[in-house]
Amino acid sequence: MTTSAAKETQPYRTLSRREFLRLSALASAGVIIGCAVNPVTGEKQFMLVSQDWEVQIDQENAPYQFSADYGATQDQDLNRYINQVGSTIAAGTHRPQMPYSFRCVNATYINAYAFPGGSIAATRGIMLSLESEAALAALLGHELGHVNARHTARQMSKSMLTQAIIAGVSIYAASKDELYGDIASAIGMIGAGALLASYSRDNEREADYLGMQYMTQSGYGTKGFVELMAMLNSLHQGSPDAVSLLFATHPMSSERYQTAVRLAETEFADAESQPLYRERYMDNTASLRKIKPAIELFQKGDELTAGKKFGDAETALARGLKIAPNDYAGLVIMSKCKLAQGKHNEALQFSAKAGQVYPQEAQADYISGYCSLQLNRLDAAVADFTAYEKKLPGNPNTRFYRGLAYEKMGRKQEAAADYTAFLHQVNQGEEAQHAYNQLVKWGFIKPDTQAR
């Protein structure tokens, strides 16, 4: 779901007005202002984004996406396994020097994604859909293909010269989150798909080819890639909500599956007999598969909440939490379901427990802060938003809501500091107008010192 509020408040690295105007002027004059060698093809291509900038973009945005997906799983053995498989493949790519990292995130929907600096994640949902280490290698190889072909950087380079957005060009597509889009927008959270790049069909074809190349040269059989494409093609034909975000960012078609089969039988035929490591995959994902029924119920609760079928959603989520009572994602999803119904006290109970289960993760703090604010528990709201800001700094909405809590407490100095910080990042919308009006009212700024 795309909202103007989401666009205005996401913590993207953007061009300054001066940078944008300079680039636009050079482009209109026909000047070649950026050229780099494609690390995959060896050919020169138009490129305005340096490798250092790719890494910076990654570092600034990936943490928000991982938090939106309920953080990296607390199963350290599973994360080590995924990172080991991914790192082995990454060593043989066209850009082995990139700071790659791999993890499984707690999200229940089916997806995997990469940020331009090499931060790569697979959701619990897609991990449960794979049946071999070779299929996992294919999945990670595909995402590595996007990083090595610099697909996001190429999109950014085009956007910098073609989008007339003087305030700056956002790196990634606006939120495509169909689940909780309204809730995320209403309380100022980052939606699940807000920071993910959307790839073209040509991007997907190139990443598929590179993925097969990378995984086979790492010793995996081509059947793993064909398995992955067959699974995705089957899901695409069914089009359940659990994969809506996956196919919004990674266009799927039967052509991709057919191409995988053809490549496996021709160009990569020598790798057909290489191992798939099914048993090794099953052994390393045993703890995850043990709670598969709970994860599926959490996903069902997601979908039902999105459809505003709250009673059925609560039933599904309660069943899931009976199986996995300390599942962070399940607790937060239930909290969101309660929040969507205006049940702030009940929502707070679940978000507070989630915070206890996974104290390093920030999303539960944000929800707890918002619920406490609605319940007029102002000290608690300040504490929760402060905890969130320490774990995941940079979301302007955190500063706005904490400022609002301070305002209600009569602590104008602290409120003014937060409102000022908020206005440095956001200058449109009801929240921005409220912050501005209060700063004027309290005498911190003069009405004519800042254009509204």
Where do the PLM segments sit?
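Canonical tetratricopeptide repeat
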Residues: 333, 367, 401, 435-438
